[in-house]
A protein has these predicted regions:
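Active-site-proximal beta-alpha core segment in soluble small-molecule metabolic enzymes
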Residues: 2, 6-17, 29-171, 175-182, ...
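Conserved PLP-enzyme active-site core in the AAT-like
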Residues: 25
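Active-site anion/phosphate-binding pocket segments in diverse small-molecule metabolic enzymes
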Residues: 2-19, 66, 83-85, 101-108, ...
């Protein structure tokens, strides 16, 4: 197959380092991995295989399609969105556990004869999960539960809501048959031992995202997009460049045109905001990001030529600040056109 003119360099050692770091930060608790949304855009199978090799045992996906994709790996999978009627055949096949979220799902699982499951309890986020009141009233009595979990709404912020959510989950200890309890996502791990329970569930930080500045020094960048120069040109002073002529050359300007655009997840938010690296120089994106192309000011890189590969700046906290996109959006938006190359 023809090599793609776009590639993601994916760093196995950095991914495994990040998991080991989060596992160490999780103390006595086991450390799992959220690999939903195709492993946050990196490729769920490749990510899960490497994390399993590092010692990870608990993997979380969103739905049964995603679980089926990973089933051949033989890992312990949990499906965060629970079970619909149409999921029951897959759910009863036993290659993953549903995370039951509603009284209807609990009933469906009981009637269908399902065995071990996980359960999500809502402790204040008001997204998915049974209410604490329902659990206290016995909604889960008799159910074979592996993990009773909840999810933090604001783990990356120092707000009092974290403590309230933590206390609400802790209050259910012993109220069900659950073998384990779980609360913390990536940022929640940094909230300390009170938040670790028996199992943590990081996603973002595994992939090099930094949910809290104090975690930045300990995590390594995993994803490095690269694109190629399609054309180099000189834009005369006063000429415009790109769609809607939003950029105008203040002087004669050397420009390189690269084959990456918003169809590759490099969204228009990077117009006049993104940058690339080439042989130690940082070249700014100028003008509007197109579907398949961007332009950079190459004035300080006289040696940059048609066909050269360049690195798209993709340190997640920095590029999130530059673009206004979340680190999660930067990862999960990475499109299908990249060759994903694991080192
Ligand atoms: C996505 C998700 C996680 C992982 O969250 P990060 O912020 O990416 O670490 C953990 N638990 C649940 C329920 C999730 O949906």
């Amino acid at each position: 197959m023809t090599p793609s003119p776009l590639r993601l360099l994916l760093d196995t050692a950095a991914l495994q380092h990040n998991w080991r770091t989060l596992a160490a930060m999780s103390g006595r608790a086991a450390c799992g991995a959220a690999v939903k949304a195709d492993g946050y855009g990196l490729g769920a199978r490749e990510v899960a295989t490497r994390l399993a090799e590092a010692g990870c045992r608990d993997f979380f996906v969103s739905n049964w399609r995603e679980a089926e994709h990973l089933a051949p790996l033989g890992l312990q999978l949990s499906v965060l969105h629970g079970v619909r009627d149409e999921d029951m055949p897959a759910a009863l096949a036993g290659f993953a556990r549903p995370v039951l979220n509603t009284p209807e799902q609990v009933e469906r699982w009981r009637v269908g004869g399902g065995r071990a499951c996980d359960v999500m309890v809502d402790t204040g986020m008001n997204r998915l999960g049974l209410s604490v009141t329902d659990v206290e009233a016995g909604a889960l009595d008799g159910l074979e539960i592996e993990t009773l979990m909840s999810h933090l709404a604001c783990a990356e912020e120092p707000v009092e809501m974290n403590r309230r959510q933590r206390d609400a989950l802790a209050g259910l200890a012993g109220r069900t048959n659950a073998r384990r309890m779980s609360l913390a996502n990536s940022a929640g791990i940094a909230l300390g031992p009170d938040y670790h329970f028996d199992l943590t569930r990081p996603g973002l930080a595994l992939y090099g995202g930094v949910p809290r500045p104090d975690m930045g020094a300990r995590l390594r960048q995993v994803v490095r997009p690269q694109a190629q120069v399609l054309q180099r040109r000189r834009v005369p002073a006063g000429d415009s460049l790109g769609y809607n002529a939003t950029w105008r050359a203040p002087r004669d300007t050397e420009v390189a045109i690269l084959n990456i655009g918003y169809a590759d997840g490099y969204l228009r938010a990077f117009s006049d905001r993104g940058s690339i690296e080439w042989e130690g120089s940082t070249l700014p994106v100028i003008g509007r990001v197109s579907m398949d192309l961007i332009a950079v000011d190459a004035s300080i890189a006289p040696g940059l030529r048609e066909g050269d590969w360049v690195a798209i700046a993709f340190d997640l906290p920095g590029q999130s600040a530059a673009s206004g996109l979340s680190q999660y959006e930067l990862l999960t938006g990475l499109g299908a056109r990249y060759d994903r190359l694991w080192s």
